[in-house]
């Protein structure tokens, strides 16, 4: 028996954002990105920790959403 056989991981499938949702999010972030992003990240400490761990583990330095880069980098470092 391998050590990893005792683990059971269940992941929910990701939810897609409609084009309207995506447009609204982009508009909101471009208008007041810094304050909104900070509020979202700090209001969800568990998700912030998961994101931080993921970025540390994967050493992912590139995001598709360029508007998020500065704030996420500031919060996570």
UniProtKB/Swiss-Prot annotation:
InterPro entries assigned to the protein according to its UniProt record, in alphabetical order: Poxvirus_A2.5L
Entry keywords, A to Z: Disulfide bond
Protein name: Protein OPG128
Induction (free text): Expressed in the late phase of the viral replicative cycle.
Organism: Monkeypox virus
Summary of subunit composition and partner proteins: Interacts with sulfhydryl oxidase OPG072; this interaction involves formation of a transient disulfide-bonded intermediate, allowing disulfide bond transfer. Interacts with OPG088; this interaction involves formation of a transient disulfide-bonded intermediate, allowing disulfide bond transfer.
Family: Belongs to the orthopoxvirus OPG128 family.
Functional note: Late protein which probably participates in disulfide bond formation by functioning as a thiol-disulfide transfer protein between membrane-associated OPG072 and OPG08. The complete pathway for formation of disulfide bonds in intracellular virion membrane proteins sequentially involves oxidation of OPG072, OPG128 and OPG08.
Chain segments annotated as coiled-coil in the UniProt record: none
Pfam family, one: Pox_A3L
